[in-house]
């Protein structure tokens, strides 16, 4: 019995690693992801910068205030870094299709283009 347990547990652990949700898997929820709904209001996020080897060089918290007027999504991002420095970036996003967006912000060269996919 112990021998079977020693074989079965590692096999189940390995099998479970391959069954993680994917962004392409629309079956995780019945609600389609809506960028404008998600960011309309207050959101807090946490992040970090790291190099190619995974070494963290800087951490931050960002408070995001979003407002949606029916065609434009405005995001005011207030960053606070772990060293106490602060930065603000204001994004203006325009919905170009059912899941397409184009955005711009001061300090960003060119336009950002993106697509939404998946569920909430």
Where are these regions (language model features)?
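Sec-dependent signal peptide recognition
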Residues: 2-10
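Exposed boundary/loop context
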Residues: 9-11, 34, 59
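C-terminal motif of bacterial Sec signal peptides marking the signal peptidase cleavage site
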Residues: 15-16
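Extracellular beta-rich ligand/substrate-recognition surface
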Residues: 22-25
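N-terminal helix-cap/turn-to-beta initiation motif at the start of protein domains
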Residues: 27-42
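Central antiparallel beta-sheet cores of small beta-barrel/beta-sandwich binding domains
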Residues: 46, 50-120
């Amino acid at each position: 019995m112990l021998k079977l347990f020693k074989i079965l547990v590692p096999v189940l652990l390995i099998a479970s690693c391959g069954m993680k949700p994917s962004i392409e898997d629309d079956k995780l929820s019945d609600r389609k992801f809506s960028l404008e709904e998600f960011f309309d209001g207050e959101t807090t996020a946490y992040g970090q910068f790291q190099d190619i080897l995974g070494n963290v060089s800087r951490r931050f918290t960002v408070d995001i205030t979003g407002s949606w007027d029916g065609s434009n999504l405005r995001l005011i991002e207030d960053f606070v870094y772990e060293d106490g420095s602060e930065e603000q970036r204001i994004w203006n996003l325009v919905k170009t299709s059912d899941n397409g967006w184009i955005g711009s912000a001061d300090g960003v060269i060119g336009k950002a283009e993106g697509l939404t996919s998946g569920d909430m």
